[in-house]
A protein has these predicted regions:
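An amphipathic, basic-hydrophobic alpha-helix
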Residues: 1-15
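Acidic donor-binding loop of glycosyltransferase active sites
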Residues: 13-15, 175-190, 197-198
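Short alpha-helical segment that forms part of, or immediately flanks, the ligand-binding pocket
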Residues: 29, 171, 189-197, 217
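Active-site-proximal region of nucleotide-activated glycan assembly enzymes
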Residues: 32-92
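Structural loop-to-beta junction motif characteristic of Rossmann-like glycosyltransferase folds
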Residues: 36-37, 178-179, 196-204, 224
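Donor-nucleotide binding loops and adjacent catalytic segments primarily
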Residues: 92-179, 213-217, 221, 228-238
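A short, well-ordered alpha-helix in the C-terminal region of glycosyltransferases
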Residues: 251-265
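C-terminal alpha-helical cap of glycosyltransferases
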Residues: 264-283
């Protein structure tokens, strides 16, 4: 705290911006003492502990996901989560709806993959209708220790699959996919929305405050995604959802459009503008 006050006295900032986490506390507290305008950015649909502590004290909460659960009387605006240029390159990519031609399913489970997501997806393949098994091509992110097991399950199902621990070109693959199966991290939600793809979301049950379920809410309520909790997740349930989307070009196209409607491709600029305005005006 004293260090933060010394830094403020030296640097004389016109605004202080926090992104959550305990290291932000001293600067935000010191800014309050010095009556410097403060903003916090929350990437998830539920505020983290530090952002929750300051939500009613700062000028505004910049929300990366919408809706976001907020304390009463907290001022907030949906600005979105900034994404990489590699994602923006495929913003609102033309969507090829499912039909009687090769179809692409992208399965991603966060930065290090997810055993339950990849395994359940692999086991769901044998439960799909024959026309889907014949047409489907799957790109599945898998934890390194699970690769051999998942490869065998896909092979036994007869569905063509590319199995990798990490895909360097997820945005490109997502732009080519008819459907995405994904965890509900804030970055994944932003990518799916900006590129504009139908999705089946499987929130990570152990996420702090169950924030991944909250992250899913906007896409689900807009009709862009289906959500399956880990407690509900089985190969049969997942196969039914995959079949539902990939058997209807109208439904899939509607979901893709709904995803784009939730996107914030200009999130970085919106956030920067917010900072500049509050920095100049003080509120």
């Amino acid at each position: 705290m004293l260090g933060a006050l010394r830094s403020i006295n030296k640097e004389k900032p016109s605004i202080i911006v926090g992104f959550g986490g305990y290291p932000a506390i001293p600067a935000l507290m010191a800014g309050g003492i010095r009556k410097i305008p403060r903003i916090i950015h929350e990437q998830n649909g539920i505020l983290g502990r530090v952002n929750r502590l300051f939500a009613k004290k700062v000028e505004i909460v910049a929300c990366g996901t919408w809706p976001t659960e907020l304390p009463k009387n907290a001022k907030a605006k949906y600005v979105g989560n900034p994404v990489r240029n590699k994602v923006l390159k495929f913003s609102n990519s033309p969507y090829i709806p499912p039909g009687n031609w090769p179809l692409s399913l992208l399965v991603i489970g966060g930065s290090q993959g997810s055993s339950i997501v990849s395994r359940t997806t692999a086991e769901a393949m044998s439960l799909l209708p024959e026309f889907l098994r014949n047409n489907l091509r799957v790109a599945c992110q898998v934890r390194e220790e699970d690769i051999m097991e998942i490869e065998k399950i896909f092979m036994d199902s007869g569905v063509s699959a590319e199995i990798e621990y990490f895909f360097e070109d997820v945005p490109r693959r997502m732009s080519q996919a008819q459907l995405v199966v994904s965890r509900s991290g804030a970055s994944s939600i932003a990518d799916i929305s900006i590129i504009g793809r139908p999705s089946i979301l499987i929130p990570f049950a152990a996420a702090a405050g169950d924030h991944q379920t909250a992250n899913s809410k906007g896409l689900v309520e807009s009709g862009a995604a289906n959500m399956i909790t880990e407690n509900e997740l089985t190969p049969l349930v997942l196969a039914d959802y995959i079949t539902k989307v990939l058997s209807s070009d109208k439904l899939a196209s509607k979901m893709a459009k709904a995803a784009v409607s939730r996107s914030k491709p200009n999130a970085l600029a919106e956030f920067a503008d917010m900072i500049e305005v509050i920095s100049k005006n003080g509120s």
